[in-house]
Amino acid sequence: MTSLQLQMETVTLEQYEALPENVRAEVFDGVIYDMASPSQSHQIILTELLVLIRNYLRKQKGKCQVFPAPFDVKLSDKPLTIVQPDIMVVCDADKLDEKRCNGAPDFIIEIVSPGNPANDYIRKLYYYKNAGVREYWIVDPRRKIVTVNYFEKNILNIQYSFDSIIKVNIYDELLIDFSEIAELLET
């Protein structure tokens, strides 16, 4: 399913917050877009990555926290840009309030929806890089590819297959074995 523009005029934060709870949407430059519901494979990947990252962060006993969607990230006020990454890691607690992360998370993972891959590969890549996200992964279940963008070192579009062990660059020792996740998708 492609993302649909919900209204033509630009929206305010108040209008966005007034949307019904069951509406999944993101705002880019003041324009609100509908989000498709995730697939089963999307949710399997999300759950596995979330648990792996959470367990690593707990062992580190650091200040970083991991959040799954739906949790808003307000990248800018004017024009309003609010996204809901599939997974994000935030290491600056001052960016967090009860409603959202205000500013760029340190690490974002998006799992590609079949109907609108350009949203993750182009639009969000642009917004995340410009907002100051340190690292951004695009996980594509259909193509079985993970694209790593390590903005902090200007390393872009490094692709790995689902049989790879991939290092999370912002951490010294966090490795994700995608072959284990791929096995779960085949059962």
What are these regions (language model features)?
Residues 1-187:
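Gly/Pro/Ser/Thr-rich low-complexity, intrinsically disordered segments predominantly at protein N-termini
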